[in-house]
């Protein structure tokens, strides 16, 4: 067996309960290298510090101090700007500097930096993403936003990660909320919210050109141009394209070639001192490589498709903001989003229209009140290609109408605040839903924060839950037996009641620590109801069908904690990371027996995750960055524990040029991160690429 945690041959056995030897060797190797590097540079850095300070690095390379990091304003937790210190939620901010120095080439890769997130690459262009458990390829209990636009698909209540893209250089920050956010964001914000926020156009004047390529990320090209008309209107336009090769396939199928091209624009217009208008949009077209297995009623009974299929879409978003006074403001936002997917098993065409209004006012006594209303309509068209996979009806319009009210009460000014609120929604699947929460914040000093929260959130049913008809071959002959999974109109919303506690502190301005502890109780989770067996004559030939209806058959509990320290002992070195612990237990509700989903849910999330990121800023404008990740075993996905490391060397010879070399997954030739629905598991390969960026 090779040094990989993933066997080269399918017949090789994996031990899911012991750490991979290469992971242990990797920890030792990284630790040794870090120690040698520290001993080497310690004697040189003090002498070099004056020279470094005189080189005036460009603005976008300057680092926030840890104190400034705590004062960064975020909006995802309450829809209003508030400092991280005063946010009563488990929030983590991935900054533009974090993104640039991670060496990541996709948004999903960047999310690995956040504590509590489970990000596993299943092949070249698919990911399984989750927060505090229940991770999967479609992230069904997670809400993802791009500049306030939800990228949730009502077909399966999840996210197509391979089409969520923009210029990574244009992302200002990514705000990650671990824990329920249904009161503010509504349906699907059950386990967490990821809010991707791009830069204002006033921060992207000039031109940017970026080119890169390597053995897996074979070619990446990006261009962006921005400017102003001098009368309050700022703009940017961009284009990008890439081709990514396949990962490691034991059978040599190499089906996951990935290509995408994308164009986009944004304008921000200060109409006057009170009004701001934003208009932005994107268009994309690509090839999404995957393996699909389809069961048939006639020989050969099962057909496997390898290779890319067409995906495309676009969106247009408008936002108007008015500041009535220092104590009140209003925002109205609307967007249109179109998605087209032409895959071997079925086609999906979807148009989504969304509008919402948010009003904020600070009343006498310092209370901050938020009121909002919104609506979303999402008509689709599903084209059936095989009798064994269908959604009935083929055309459906998903609709959600919502309102929410939130009041932040300052019990002790600048010390203790209580936030009460609730979301009220009506959808065409489960009817009326209410999602309340209560949050308490205590800041005894300017460098300490305690918070606690109790929240109810729901995941409303999707088309898959109520309309799916999927038939899978179990036995090809004597007799021919099929398993049929069917949606149910009785499927109702999954429910969560979450309790959280948190603590943040800044110690001596050099060490920042963020701790969050949680306990979540789930009810009415996705599972299978009572099965039936019958003989079916049509379509011919006659065959046996074992039919399972989808039902709210399971309950579950998750408990755990995340700790994320950030240490900056000197100006030129930052060391940060996180440790995440999760215990997940899913079991049948009374009257149900669903061993398939209980085993899958209980064994598909890691108990332990570790991330360590070291950022060195050398003299002569060199940067050396290393990230180590450890993920414990996923028995249900046939994945052993693994550790891997990414390394980046960057150089800024002049402020307008940046050159970098990145190595990814360096500790083994390839390793598995998540299971496969079809045949063999894909191994994620060791890779490297070079990149050059020019800014003007």
Question: Regions from the language model: what does each represent?
Answer:
Residues 257-378, 512:
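Outer-membrane beta-barrel domain signature, strongest for Gram-negative TonB-dependent receptors
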Residues 150-178:
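Short acidic/polar hinge/loop motifs at secondary-structure boundaries
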Residues 287, 293-298, 380-384, 394, ...:
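Surface-exposed extracellular loop regions of Gram-negative outer-membrane beta-barrel proteins
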Residues 182-183, 195, 203-204, 212, ...:
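Periplasmic-side early beta-strands and strand-to-turn transitions of outer-membrane beta-barrels
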Residues 75-92, 108, 112-153, 172:
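Extracytoplasmic beta-strand/coil segments of soluble accessory domains associated
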Residues 410-417, 518-522, 540-634:
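Gram-negative outer-membrane beta-barrel transporters
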Residues 264, 352-358, 396-398, 402-404, ...:
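Outer membrane beta-barrel strand-and-loop segments of large Gram-negative receptors
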Residues 458, 650-696:
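C-terminal beta-signal and adjacent terminal beta-strands/loops
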């Amino acid at each position: 067996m090779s040094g990989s945690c993933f066997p080269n041959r399918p017949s090789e056995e994996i031990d899911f309960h012991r750490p991979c030897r290469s992971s242990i060797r990797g920890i030792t190797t990284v630790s040794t290298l870090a120690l040698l590097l520290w001993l080497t540079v310690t004697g040189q850095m003090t002498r070099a510090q004056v020279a470094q300070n005189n080189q005036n690095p460009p603005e976008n390379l300057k680092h926030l101090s840890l104190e400034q990091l705590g004062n960064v304003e975020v909006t995802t937790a309450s829809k209003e700007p508030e400092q991280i210190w005063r946010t009563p939620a488990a929030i983590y901010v991935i900054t533009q500097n974090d993104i640039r120095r991670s060496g990541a080439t996709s948004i999903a890769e960047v999310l690995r930096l956040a504590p509590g997130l489970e990000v596993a690459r299943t092949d070249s262009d698919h990911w399984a993403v989750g927060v505090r458990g229940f991770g999967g390829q479609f992230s069904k209990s997670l809400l993802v936003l791009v500049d306030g636009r939800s990228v949730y698909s009502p077909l399966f209540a999840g996210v197509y990660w391979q089409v969520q893209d923009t210029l990574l250089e244009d992302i200002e920050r990514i705000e990650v909320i671990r824990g329920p956010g249904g009161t503010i964001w509504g349906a699907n914000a059950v386990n967490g919210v990821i809010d991707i926020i791009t830069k204002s156009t006033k921060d992207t004047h000039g031109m940017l050109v970026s080119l890169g390529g390597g053995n897996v990320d074979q070619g990446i090209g990006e261009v962006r141009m921005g400017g102003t008309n001098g009368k309050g209107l700022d703009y940017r336009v961009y284009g990008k394209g890439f081709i990514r090769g396949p990962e490691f396939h034991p059978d040599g199928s190499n089906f996951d070639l990935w290509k995408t091209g994308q164009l986009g624009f944004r304008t921000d217009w200060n109409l006057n001192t009170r009004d701001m208008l934003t208009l932005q949009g994107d268009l994309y077209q690509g090839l999404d490589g995957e393996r699909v297995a389809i069961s048939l009623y006639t020989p050969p009974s099962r057909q496997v498709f390898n290779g890319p299929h067409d995906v495309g879409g676009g969106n247009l978003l408008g936002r108007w903001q008015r500041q009535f006074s220092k104590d009140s403001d209003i925002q109205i936002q609307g967007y249109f989003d179109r998605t087209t997917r032409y895959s071997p098993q079925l086609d999906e065409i979807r148009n989504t229209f969304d509008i919402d209004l948010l009003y904020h006012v600070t009343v006498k006594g310092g209370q901050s009140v938020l009121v909002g209303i919104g609506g979303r309509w999402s008509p689709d068209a599903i084209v059936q290609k095989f009798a064994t996979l269908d959604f009935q009806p083929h055309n459906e319009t998903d609709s959600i109408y919502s309102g929410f009210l939130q009041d932040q009460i300052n019990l002790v000014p600048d010390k203790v605040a209580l936030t009460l609120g609730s979301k009220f929604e009506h959808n065409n699947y489960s009817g009326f839903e209410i999602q309340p929460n209560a949050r308490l914040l205590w800041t005894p000093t300017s460098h300490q924060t305690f918070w606690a929260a109790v929240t109810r959130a729901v995941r409303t049913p999707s088309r898959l839950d109520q309309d799916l008809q999927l038939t899978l071959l179990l036995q090809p002959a004597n007799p021919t037996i099929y398993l049929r999974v069917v949606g149910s109109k009785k499927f109702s919303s999954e429910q969560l009641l979450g309790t959280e506690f948190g603590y943040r502190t800044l110690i001596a301005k050099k060490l920042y620590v963020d701790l969050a502890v949680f306990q979540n109780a789930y009810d009415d989770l996705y599972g299978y109801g009572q099965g039936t067996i019958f003989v079916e004559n049509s379509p011919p030939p006659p065959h046996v069908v074992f039919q399972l209806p989808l039902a709210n058959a399971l309950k579950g509990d998750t408990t755990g904690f995340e700790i994320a320290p950030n240490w900056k002992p000197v100006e030129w070195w930052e060391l940060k990371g996180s440790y995440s612990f999760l215990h997940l237990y899913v079991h049948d509700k009374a009257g149900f027996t669903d061993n398939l989903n209980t085993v899958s849910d209980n064994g598909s999330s890691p108990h332990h995750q570790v991330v360590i990121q070291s950022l060195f800023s050398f003299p002569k404008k060199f940067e050396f960055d290393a990230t180590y990740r450890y993920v414990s075993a996923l028995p249900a996905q046939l994945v052993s524990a693994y550790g891997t490391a990414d390394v980046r060397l960057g150089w800024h010879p002049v402020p307008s040029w940046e050159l970098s070399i990145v190595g990814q997954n360096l500790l083994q030739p390839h390793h598995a991160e998540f299971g496969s629905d079809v045949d063999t598991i894909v191994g994620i390969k060791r890779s490297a690429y070079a990149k050059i960026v020019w800014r003007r």
